[in-house]
């Protein structure tokens, strides 16, 4: 395991993103975190903003237990609140193929929010197979499998404070 982005760098960047988002949404924003990977990012991002932020969560699965996508997307938990007429910001840990967010944006657009944008901590642009417009990006990273700060490998390592590259598949 090798540290790719340290805790300090993550926290610094999240503060910058929070300040930018706060400026863009002076009347408040409805944050939608994608379970479970985005939970740490969402918690820190929300506290980096001084505007009103409502929190909601949605569950989507597109990955199996390993490092590759199953290519299949399904909603595993829906939102608690309606997004109709709201300024909505989807908060995601990482955009990889784009399949998950491309699908989710279609679903949410049908519910007629006033505005709909995406904040993603990490972006692997080389891997994109479906178009996704990400308005706020923390870091662009190369095509490597990362864990920590919410990101998992087979549900492990989410609680690491740094973002690390998993170089070998653990036994
Ligand atoms: P996409 O649909 O391929 O864009 O995949 C997005 C989802 O795949 C993210 O929400 C993550 O849960 C997962 N994912 C993609 N790349 C990584 C990675 O490097 N580490 C951990 N999870 C990843
Ligand atoms: Mg995820």
Predicted regions mapped to residue ranges:
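PRPP-associated nucleotide enzymes
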Residues: 1-171
């Amino acid at each position: 395991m090798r540290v790719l982005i340290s805790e300090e760098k993550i926290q610094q960047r999240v503060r910058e993103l929070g300040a930018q988002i706060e400026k863009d949404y002076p009347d408040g924003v409805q944050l939608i975190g994608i379970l479970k990977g985005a939970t740490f990012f969402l918690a820190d991002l929300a506290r980096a903003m001084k505007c009103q932020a409502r929190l909601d969560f949605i569950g989507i699965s597109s990955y199996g237990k390993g490092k590759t996508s199953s290519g299949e997307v399904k909603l595993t938990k829906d939102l608690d609140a309606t997004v109709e007429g709201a300024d909505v910001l989807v908060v995601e840990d990482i955009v990889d193929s784009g399949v998950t967010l491309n699908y989710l944006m279609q679903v949410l657009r049908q519910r007629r929010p006033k505005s709909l944008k995406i904040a993603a901590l990490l972006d692997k642009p080389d891997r994109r197979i479906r178009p996704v417009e990400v308005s706020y990006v923390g870091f662009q990273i190369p095509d490597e499998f990362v864990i920590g700060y919410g990101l998992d490998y087979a549900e492990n390592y989410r609680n690491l404070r740094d973002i690390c590259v998993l170089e070998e598949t653990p036994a």
